[in-house]
C-alpha cells in the first residue's frame, strides 16, 4: 500500500478527535464539525457532515446516513441550541441571528464533552452576531440584567438596592437607563448616584429656613442660594445676574439662539425641555394640573398657581405708588400704565 494512502487514511480517522481547550481553543466551525458526524456505510470511517477534506469527498452523499435515521430524542446533540445539520461550509459564516430560535432556559450539560472552564466563546459570538458586552462592566451588574436576545428584563420594582436600576443597561448603546424615570447615564456610577439621590426615599439634608429636605449636600447648598440675595452668576453679554449656575446656562441659550428641543407635532423649537413639554399640551389637550378647590384643570402649573389666588385672595404684586395689590404681574403693569402713566 502506498505511503501517501496511509497518511491520508490516518488523517481521515484522526480528524475528529475531540480537541480540548488545553490543546487549542475550539472555534465555532470546529464545534459544529465535532458535534455532527456522518458515517460511511461501506467502511467504519466517521467524518464531519460538511467536511471539505479531499479524502472524505470520496464518500458519495448516497452513502451518508440521513438525518431522520440518525435522529434520536435522547441524543444530547439534538439539545445544542442554534445548530442545524443542514449547515454547509459556505452558509455557516452568514447565519443570521434572527433565523435562530434561542432556548429560554439553556442547559450547558450536553456540551460537557466540549466545554471547559477556560473555553473561549469569541468565535461563536462573532459568528452569530451576539451583542458584545464591554469588558469594563462588573459581572455582578450583568447577572440577571443583560439579555443577549433583547428580551425585556424582569425588574423587581420593590427592591431598594441601587444596582437593580441598571437592569435596562443597553450593550449596543453603552448606556444605563433608570427604570423609574427613564433617565439615561453613560456610567453605572452615575446611575447609582442618581438612584440614591432621587429614588432611595432618604433625604437627610434639611434646609433650616424653609424645611425642605434633599438627598445630597450639594443640592442643599444650591438651594440655600434661593434664600440669599446674592447673585454670584453674571451673564457676560448682558450683565444679568442669577443665583444658580443652571439658570445662567439656560439664559445663555437666549443669546446664542440655541433651541435644541423641537416639538414633535409642529416642529417649534424651545430653549428648555420643560418649555417644550408644556407646549405639547396644546396639541394633546392634556391638563395635568387640577385645582383642589373647584376642580378646574390647567395645562401649565403657573396657570394653576395664579388661579388658586382667587380662592385664597393672595395678591403678591403691589403698586409702590398706591399700595394696591394684584394677583398677577401683568395686572400690576397695566395698572401702572393706566393709572400712573408709567411704563
From Swiss-Prot:
Signal peptide per UniProt: none
GO CC annotation terms, alphabetical: chromosome; nucleus
Disulphide bond pairs: none
Positions of region (SNAG domain): 1-20
Gene3D superfamilies cross-referenced by the UniProt entry: Classic Zinc Finger
Annotated localization: Nucleus
Any one Gene Ontology BP term: chromatin organization
Pfam family, one: zf-C2H2
Zinc finger residue ranges, C2H2-type: 176-199, 205-227, 233-255, 261-283, 289-311, 317-340
InterPro entries recorded: Znf_C2H2_sf, Znf_C2H2_type
Chain residue ranges for the region called Disordered: 51-77
Keyword Transcription regulation on entry: yes
Top-level division of the source organism's lineage: Eukaryota
Basic and acidic residues composition bias: residue spans: 67-77
Listed GO MF terms: chromatin insulator sequence binding; DNA-binding transcription factor activity, RNA polymerase II-specific; RNA polymerase II cis-regulatory region sequence-specific DNA binding; zinc ion binding
Chain intervals for the UniProt region annotation (Mediates repression of transcription): 1-20
Coarse class of the protein's main subcellular location: nucleus
Keyword annotations from UniProtKB, A to Z: Chromatin regulator, Developmental protein, DNA-binding, Metal-binding, Nucleus, Repeat, Transcription, Transcription regulation, Zinc, Zinc-finger
Main function: Essential transcriptional regulator necessary for development and differentiation of erythroid and megakaryocytic lineages. Alters histone methylation by recruiting histone methyltransferase to target genes promoters. Plays a role in heterochromatin formation.
Domain notes: The zinc finger domain is essential for erythroid expansion and acts as an activation domain whereas non finger domain serves as repression domain.
Full protein name: Zinc finger protein Gfi-1b
Upper lineage: Eukaryota, Metazoa, Chordata, Craniata, Vertebrata
Protein's gene: gfi1b
Amino acid at each position: 500500500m502506498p505511503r501517501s494512502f496511509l497518511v491520508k487514511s490516518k488523517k481521515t480517522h484522526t480528524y475528529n478527535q475531540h480537541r480540548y481547550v488545553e490543546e487549542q481553543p475550539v472555534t465555532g466551525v470546529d464545534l459544529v464539525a465535532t458535534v455532527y458526524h456522518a458515517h460511511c456505510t461501506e467502511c467504519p470511517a466517521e467524518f464531519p457532515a460538511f467536511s471539505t477534506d479531499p479524502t472524505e469527498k470520496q464518500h458519495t452523499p448516497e452513502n451518508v446516513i440521513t438525518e431522520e435515521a440518525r435522529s434520536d430524542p435522547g441524543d444530547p446533540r439534538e439539545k445544542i441550541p442554534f445548530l442545524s445539520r443542514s449547515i454547509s461550509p459556505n452558509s455557516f459564516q452568514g447565519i443570521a441571528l434572527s433565523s435562530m430560535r434561542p432556548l429560554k432556559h439553556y442547559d450547558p450539560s450536553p456540551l460537557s464533552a466540549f466545554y471547559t472552564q477556560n473555553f473561549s466563546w469569541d468565535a461563536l459570538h462573532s459568528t452569530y452576531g451576539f451583542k458584545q458586552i464591554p469588558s469594563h462592566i462588573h459581572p455582578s451588574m450583568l447577572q440577571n440584567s443583560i439579555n443577549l436576545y433583547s428580551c425585556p428584563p424582569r425588574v423587581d420594582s420593590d427592591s431598594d438596592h441601587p444596582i437593580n436600576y441598571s437592569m435596562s443597561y443597553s450593550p449596543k448603546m453603552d448606556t444605563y437607563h433608570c427604570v423609574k424615570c427613564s433617565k439615561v447615564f453613560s456610567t453605572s456610577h452615575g446611575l447609582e448616584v442618581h438612584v440614591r439621590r432621587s429614588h432611595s426615599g432618604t433625604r437627610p439634608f434639611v434646609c433650616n429656613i424653609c424645611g425642605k429636605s434633599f438627598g445630597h449636600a450639594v443640592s442643599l447648598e444650591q438651594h440655600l442660594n434661593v434664600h440669599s440675595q446674592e447673585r454670584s452668576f453674571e451673564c457676560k453679554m448682558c450683565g444679568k445676574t442669577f443665583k444658580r449656575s443652571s439658570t445662567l446656562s439656560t439664559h445663555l441659550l437666549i443669546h446664542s439662539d440655541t433651541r435644541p428641543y423641537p416639538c414633535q407635532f409642529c416642529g417649534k423649537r424651545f430653549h428648555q425641555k420643560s418649555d417644550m413639554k408644556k407646549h405639547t399640551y396644546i396639541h394633546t389637550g392634556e391638563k395635568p394640573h387640577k385645582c383642589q378647590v373647584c376642580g378646574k384643570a390647567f395645562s401649565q402649573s403657573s396657570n394653576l398657581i395664579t388661579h388658586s389666588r382667587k380662592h385664597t385672595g393672595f395678591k403678591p404684586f403691589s403698586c409702590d405708588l398706591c399700595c394696591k395689590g394684584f394677583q398677577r404681574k401683568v395686572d400690576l403693569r397695566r395698572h401702572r400704565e393706566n393709572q400712573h402713566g408709567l411704563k
